[in-house]
C-alpha cells in the first residue's frame, strides 16, 4: 500500500471513482494523469482532477468560492518531507497552495458523498468503509478565493476529437463517478486558507487557530476509526455550519 494513504484508508482500496467503463473514458483519465495537485481524502477514490477537456466551457457564475479539503496531518507531513519538524498552519497552506499545483479539487455544498459505492473486497462488500483510520489525525481545511472567479461547466453536446488545456485562474465543476467537485486551476494565485478544523473522538469538529492548538491536536489521534456513515454525518454538519459554495448541476 502507498505510504501516501497509510493513515487514510484500510489496506485494500475499495472504491474507484476513476475506473474505466468505456474505452473513450481512457483519454479523460490520461487528460489529468500528469497534473500536479495536492493529495487529500479525494485521493481515496482515485479522483484525478483533469487539466484538459474535449468540451467547450460555458461560463455559469462569477463569484467568490468557499470549498473544503479533508486530509490527515500525516499525509501533509509525508508529502512535505518534514521528518521530525513540527507541522504548522503556514506549512499546510504552502502545501495546498504551492505554485507547482496546477489544480485543486474542492468539496462544495452540493458534493454528495452518498454516491460512493464500495467496491467488493473478495466476497464481502464493505458498506461502511473506513475513511480515516484509528491513530490518524484528520483535518478539514476551508479555502476561499481572494476575489471573484469565473466558474465554468463543460458543454457535453460540444465534444471535440482533441483535448485542449482548461487554463488558469478559473474553476470548473466536474463529476467523478457521481461525485461533484469544484476544480480550481492555478489555486496559488486565487485561493487562501481560511480555517482548519480537527476531529474530536466524538466525531465532532474543533477549530485549530494556532500552531500550538495544531500541535496539541496531533498528539491526540483518533481512538476509533471514522467510517463512511459517520463521515457523511460530519460532512452534512460542515455544510450546515460553513457556507460552502453551491453550484447546482444537472445530471
Curated annotation (Swiss-Prot):
UniProt-annotated location(s) = Virion; Host cytoplasm
Post-translational modification comment from the UniProt entry: Undergoes morphogenesis-associated proteolysis which cleaves the 28 kDa to a 25-kDa product. Proteolytic cleavage of major core proteins P4a (OPG136), P4b (OPG129), and VP8 (OPG098), which occurs at a late stage of core formation, is required for production of infectious mature virions (MV).
**Pfam families, sorted:** Pox_VP8_L4R
Propeptide span(s): 1-32
Site for Cleavage, residues: 18-19, 32-33
The cross-references to InterPro entries, in alphabetical order and at most eight, read: VP8_pox_nuc-bd
Q: Does the keyword Ribosomal protein apply?
A: no
Protein family per UniProt: Belongs to the orthopoxvirus OPG098 family.
> Which UniProt key words apply to this protein?
Host cytoplasm, Late protein, Virion
> In UniProt terms, what function does this protein have?
Major core structural protein.
Write out the GO MF terms: structural molecule activity
Q: What is this protein called?
A: Core protein VP8
Question: Per the record's keyword annotation, is Oxidoreductase included, yes or no?
Answer: no
Amino acid at each position: 500500500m502507498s505510504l501516501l494513504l497509510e493513515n487514510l484508508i484500510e489496506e485494500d482500496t475499495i472504491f474507484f471513482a476513476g475506473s474505466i467503463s468505456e474505452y473513450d473514458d481512457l483519454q479523460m483519465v490520461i487528460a489529468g494523469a500528469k497534473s500536479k495537485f495536492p493529495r487529500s481524502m479525494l485521493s481515496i477514490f482515485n479522483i484525478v482532477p483533469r487539466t484538459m477537456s474535449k468540451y467547450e466551457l460555458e461560463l455559469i457564475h462569477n463569484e467568490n468560492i468557499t470549498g473544503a479539503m479533508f486530509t490527515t496531518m500525516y499525509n501533509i507531513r509525508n508529502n512535505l518531507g518534514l521528518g521530525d519538524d513540527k507541522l504548522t498552519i503556514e506549512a499546510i497552506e504552502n502545501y495546498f497552495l504551492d505554485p507547482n499545483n496546477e489544480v485543486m479539487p474542492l468539496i462544495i455544498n452540493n458534493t454528495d458523498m452518498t454516491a460512493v459505492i464500495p467496491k467488493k473486497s473478495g466476497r464481502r462488500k464493505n458498506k461502511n468503509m473506513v475513511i480515516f483510520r484509528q491513530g490518524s489525525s484528520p483535518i478539514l481545511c476551508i479555502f476561499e478565493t481572494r476575489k471573484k472567479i469565473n466558474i465554468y461547466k463543460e458543454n457535453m453536446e460540444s465534444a471535440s476529437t482533441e483535448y485542449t488545456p482548461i487554463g488558469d485562474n478559473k474553476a470548473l465543476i466536474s463529476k467523478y463517478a457521481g461525485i461533484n467537485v469544484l476544480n480550481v486551476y492555478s489555486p496559488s494565485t486565487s485561493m487562501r486558507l481560511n480555517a482548519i478544523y480537527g476531529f474530536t473522538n466524538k466525531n465532532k469538529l474543533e477549530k485549530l487557530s494556532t500552531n500550538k492548538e495544531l500541535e496539541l491536536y496531533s498528539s491526540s489521534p483518533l481512538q476509533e476509526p471514522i467510517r463512511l456513515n459517520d463521515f457523511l454525518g460530519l460532512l452534512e454538519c460542515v455544510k450546515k455550519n460553513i457556507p460552502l459554495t453551491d453550484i447546482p448541476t444537472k445530471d
